[in-house]
Amino acid sequence: MPRTPKNQNLEQNTQTQSLTDLVYPESTGIPVPEYLGTVDKLPDNTEEVPQPKRRGRKPNPKTKARKEPALEQNVQAETEPEFQEKKQPVDGIAAAEKRLAEQYGVANIDAIAEPIYTGEQNYKPAESTEENAFVSENTSEAVIPQNGDMAQAQAENQGEVATDQNADPNAQQQGEAQAQNGEGQDDRRFNNQNGKFNKFNKNNKFNKNNRNNRNFQQQEEFVDDSATLPAPGSEAILKAKENWLKFRKLSMSELQELAVQKEVDFRRMRKQSLNYILQSLENEGNIIYTEGVLEVTPQGHGFLRMPDQNYQTSADDVYVSQNLIRKFNLKIGDTIEGLVRTPRDQDKYFSMRRIDRVNFEEPDKMRRRVAFEYLTPIHPEEKIHLEWNETEYSTRIMDLFSPIGKGQRSIILAPPRTGKTVLLQNVTRAIAKNHPEIILITLLIDERPEEVTEMRDIITDIKEKAAEKGIEIKAEVVASTFDEPPEHHTRVANMVLEKAKRLVESQKDVVILLDSITRFARANNVVIPHSGKILSGGVDANAMQFPKKFFGAARKIQDKIRTVKNEDGTISEEVQKNGSLTIIGTALIETGSRMDEVIFEEFKGTGNMELVLDRRIAEKRIWPAIDVFKSGTRKEERLLTLLEQNAAWNFRRGSQNETETGIMENLLKLMSKLKTNAELLAVLSKPKV
């Protein structure tokens, strides 16, 4: 409330002011008889109370008038000379009240007048009775209240405060809010939820808030509108998935040609955004289908990273709200399929509209899954057959002398230029042909770009040939070439590892082909904060933790046996197949680098299968350059039959006196005559005399 000027005296007694107002028709509207007359104003004997001096800058009267205009107007009205002349002395009030009560035939003036109140009391309107009905009908102005009750009285005059049942119960609260802010003027601190006046998310003049790490303004939360969308698995969804796969294979120039045909402005559009826009025009109901791997941010929301972009961040990534993440118990690395919503007015990204599948299963199953760390690892027991072509001798040799099982932790020790890349390509073809149920991920770190393109062409060719036979192959290539920073190498490896873990939690068999562990460890040595403890070769003491974590994640999960009660009342046991994670990684040796030797020594005893490539065999242009004597698998009796074990043992015993080159030449000659390993086993199982 503004300060009262010193040259204007206000009435200090609030009760006296209220009683005086009852007599005048200007304040209450009650007709006053002529014989009452008027009372002369007594001299003002109130003393002026000195106001304390205010330090600092003087307040701007215009600013205060804007904040509390109603209060300022009432104060000015009270301080006017005309208003001061209307004041009645205290002595003439009693006689006036008595004559007024006799005129209306009541015992007390309180029966016809509203109760007297002060600014410190809570205002309560008088009850509606027959005696004061005349007063309420002819009343035009309310009694001027004091301080905060002014807004309440104004609300009453406007009909906001009523005594009937149809009155607004929140009118009093609204009046109080108006009194605080000045005629209902909204406080700007409560208007902007994301602006600089927000109490819990204050931003500076650059609209940044580095203190609380809330620079990213989350998009509008998920709204369940699945009732208006086609059901999962319907023809519309299947067609949308086909269009997504079709547009995904097209290049940017081909997508732009389609955009021109459909009259779409593709300027400033990236490939993924243009893909979504063309999908919405092609699909029924303008629905958009997508698939990606979830990455959860520290703020709680997430984004879908695309394998085509090697799981790197992009402006076209799909936004996943916190509600969806909490609803389905989603984690980083989950493979999500569903429908996408186009950006709204203030949205920056495409957002997830509905989740249809998670890790190729129903989303509700993810709520009951067991974390990867709590699964029980065992030795591999199910063999992965690598024999797929009679002319590919490398996989036939591996299938017999160094078998690989589901959950194997395999390491290929290869000097430079010994054919490790070709060997991985043949293993990829063998797994895709013999085990289409396995999810295959090829991870290339610090490799040459042309090798990445070659591997992707191989995967595409495998998928197309399998699709012609009606078989769906789940395989992909994720790469980070040598011209990218080390941070990209570690990020890609982490996303692939988390994706594989989530698939294993969903009882899936996953195989990761890693090329190579050595380059992966080099990149991690550059990225991590140095501990100050340097090993030989310049390797930090903590540099091998993440590569070991990656390589050590390979395991076979123990199957779960549970009892099931049949319909006839008998109890039987049911075996629930769990998943497995197989990692086949390559390690560089004989490179002349001390760091590579240290990395090799760290991983030497961690794998349970080793395949050694010999440089001397490769120099003589003999492929594959496999050292049969140094290669082998731990617990191979769990993977090989007794016939296969005897055949491998007889061949090794009969070739002890020969060189590595001679052993490989003899084995290749024998395989060229025999088309399958079954025929080879029949020959090798016979002991030499």
UniProtKB/Swiss-Prot annotation:
Coiled coil: none annotated. It holds the Pfam family ATP-synt_ab. It comes from the Bacteria. Residues 170-183, 191-213 have a biased composition (Low complexity). The keyword Hydrolase applies. InterPro entries: AAA+_ATPase, ATPase_F1/V1/A1_a/bsu_nucl-bd, CSD, NA-bd_OB-fold, P-loop_NTPase, Rho_factor_ATP-bd, Rho_RNA-bd, Term_rho. Facilitates transcription termination by a mechanism that involves Rho binding to the nascent RNA, activation of Rho's RNA-dependent ATPase activity, and release of the mRNA from the DNA template. Belongs to the Rho family. This is Transcription termination factor Rho. It comes from Fibrobacter succinogenes (strain ATCC 19169 / S85). The lineage of its organism: Bacteria, Pseudomonadati, Fibrobacterota, Fibrobacteria, Fibrobacterales. The gene is rho.
